[in-house]
């Protein structure tokens, strides 16, 4: 046991013993440990594994701990002939050990075993689903992704996480992951020729998440659309309408040749409702959407367009009629709840609109001005109070001097609203700056990747040969010397 334990602890994480060795030496240590653990016959017996798991730390010896966990899961699966043994279910010993690992693993060591790490995360999801408690997996997978830090790379685990969040209605738990910009797909071209060591601490994290690293299953075009569709649904459940509109806008803006997919049409319908609920009106589709695609969306979503028109024109009777006529459609599209919220939001936007015209109104005046409001005289004051308390309506309530029975609704002065707008704009600018910085770093990394790609190096080598040949023959033209003459031909030629 002592010899095997010595191997398990031969490559501790850098903060716990390997801080002073070079990247190259540490890379050799980790690869040697992996090679040893993969040898046939090295796996310890069932009785010994729990002892080893108690003896080593998942934070210090993450590679070894993950290896032992996977061996133990395989042994139990073979013994019980079930996919999720009782010991792996929530509350079991193996579940608790897995929780401990996913909350403390060393992300640098895990770069070497992405496939095995993802399999363990999949096991966690299956275990939670087997007892109908997906919320337990949501917390663990979220923490694991945060710890791993995928640095803006979209993986299959992101899609799994948002699906589990919708299943368990645990929407707020996934916001730390959903709020991060995703700018990359896993790709091998980023480090195919760079010779980057996986243990390097100074390289951008994006180079470690490739389609061969194992951190993600194979991704399809549909996976990308589904992720943003489900993300939009999460934001809608939290009434974060702007974020929902953004995610759904990504889906409806996806490139398409001749026709749109079903998921894109579904996203458009929800996008219409998100705009009505967030801003009380229907915005134009993003500029990336071609005009003919917009026409397809509108033709396939006519009940939603009619609903939006009635809402924008503040035609209450028509709105009720459109909602009633479309009951079957709302249910089939699973949008009944959202349409009901649109109906409830009608009064809110009617009253908010009054603030653009008046500085103060009594409650009877509010009811009179909002003539199509569905509230009665007794309900209107309670409704306005709720809007003010939830900060959906920027206004104050007070009693008129000498008349304590009449409530006055006072809208903010232009100077106050201007200050609020400035604060909102400042906050948005900070958000946009952070997003632009992320995109800028991604562009820089992409530029470096393209410059060191196999295709570009071939072009440079060919152009250098052509330049040398031209110099020897004494006919060096500026275009040929720079390699510009054959650049397009080379890129389009062999296609390698």
Curated annotation (Swiss-Prot):
GO cellular component, one term: COP9 signalosome
PANTHER family (UniProt xref): 26S PROTEASOME NON-ATPASE REGULATORY SUBUNIT 3/COP9 SIGNALOSOME COMPLEX SUBUNIT 3, COP9 SIGNALOSOME COMPLEX SUBUNIT 3
PROSITE patterns the record matches: PCI
The organism of origin for this protein: Emericella nidulans (strain FGSC A4 / ATCC 38163 / CBS 112.46 / NRRL 194 / M139)
Subunit annotation: Component of the COP9 signalosome (CSN) complex.
Keyword Disulfide bond: no
Keyword Cytoplasm: yes
Span of domain PCI: 243-411
Compartments in which it is found: Cytoplasm; Nucleus
Stated family: Belongs to the CSN3 family.
Keywords: Cytoplasm, Nucleus, Signalosome
Record's protein name: COP9 signalosome complex subunit 3
